[in-house]
Amino acid sequence: MKQALVDYITSDGITHGLDFHTEAKGAFLEAFDRIILQPREMDYRLQFTGPTGANAVEAALKLARKVTGRDRIVAFTNGFHGVTLGALACTGNGYHRKGASRPLDGVD
């Protein structure tokens, strides 16, 4: 197992994808299903969650921009989604938004 981990890391595989699918997560899910769930006839679903809601907002921003090809995001007043640059940009509340030294481009 240690060698498999070293091989994956040295092949420049994604090691931390937060909310996104990676080869490592896919391989883990296949192995977990084969080794743990199927032998016990368990029909479970697994979910990888990010550490915070702000991480989910950041992932959603990236995914929305990638899928649509657009770069504009709409922000609503009084929405608060965390203190990362992207999450702060997604609130229309000036008090929270000014906490970031530089606003994220493309958020109105």
What residue spans do the PLM features occupy?
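Glycine-rich phosphate-binding segment of PLP-dependent enzymes
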Residues: 1-23, 27-48
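PLP-dependent aspartate aminotransferase-fold enzymes
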Residues: 29-108
